[in-house]
């Protein structure tokens, strides 16, 4: 199906945001952005100057799957994300069981491919059980599909532990995401 979206304010590209552009879409794929596009046989929709932009990315989602799917699962999280304009989300590791091994990563990746309307990328836990004591098997989780390391909403109490995680994680060129808070200073 061919569609031309007319009079779009295109945000996040090299196009002048103060000019209205047309977007030619064929079979769900943007083929061209330009001025006064005419495509034979295309349905034309005037969007009246509304903003069109790339999908958003949420890098801190607490999806309750696995473990508490009655609250939210991968399918419902993806529907909520898509409704809000997000085309990619990450999955924090503080699920039940924690994403601290390749089996749980494989579950998230597989279920996301099967049920999700958006891209879902899991973070692996930096520690077993998100407890900040023993380093999780980051290499195996990396091979299974994690895109970063985090202990979710848990604090890292030991700078030495975090340093060791960073050294290990550097081998895989993965980002380490952590709450920058020291309980001994914050009184938590």
Give the location of each predicted region:
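N-terminal metal-binding scaffold of metallo-dependent hydrolase/deaminase domains
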Residues: 1-39
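Hydrophobic/aromatic beta-strand patches that form the interior of the parallel beta-sheet core
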Residues: 5, 43-45, 57, 90, ...
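Divalent metal-coordination and catalytic microenvironments
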Residues: 8, 23, 28, 49, ...
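Conserved residues at the C-terminal ends of beta-strands
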Residues: 11, 92, 152
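Active-site metal-binding motif and surrounding structural segment of the metallo-beta-lactamase
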Residues: 37-52
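Metal-associated gating/positioning segment near the N- to mid-region
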Residues: 48-112
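Histidine/acidic-residue-rich, glycine-tolerant segments that coordinate divalent metal ions
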Residues: 95-106, 111-188
């Amino acid at each position: 199906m061919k569609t031309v979206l007319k009079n779009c304010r295109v945000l996040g590209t090299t196009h002048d945001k103060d000019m209205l552009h047309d977007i030619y879409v064929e079979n769900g794929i943007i083929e061209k952005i330009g001025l006064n596009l005419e495509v034979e046989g295309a349905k034309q929709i005037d969007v009246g100057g509304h903003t069109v932009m790339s999908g958003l990315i949420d890098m801190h989602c607490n999806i309750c799957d696995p473990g508490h799917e009655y609250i939210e699962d991968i399918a419902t999280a993806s529907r909520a994300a898509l409704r809000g304009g997000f085309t990619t989300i990450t999955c924090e590791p503080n699920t039940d069981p924690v994403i601290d091994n390749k089996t749980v990563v494989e579950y998230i990746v597989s279920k996301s491919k099967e049920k999700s309307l958006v891209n879902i990328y899991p973070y692996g836990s930096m520690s077993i059980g998100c407890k900040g004591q023993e380093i999780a098997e980051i290499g195996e989780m990396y091979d299974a599909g994690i895109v970063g390391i985090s202990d979710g909403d848990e604090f890292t109490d030991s700078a030495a532990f975090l340093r060791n995680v960073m050294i290990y994680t550097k081998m895989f060129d993965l980002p380490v995401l952590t709450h920058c808070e020291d309980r001994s200073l914050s009184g938590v």
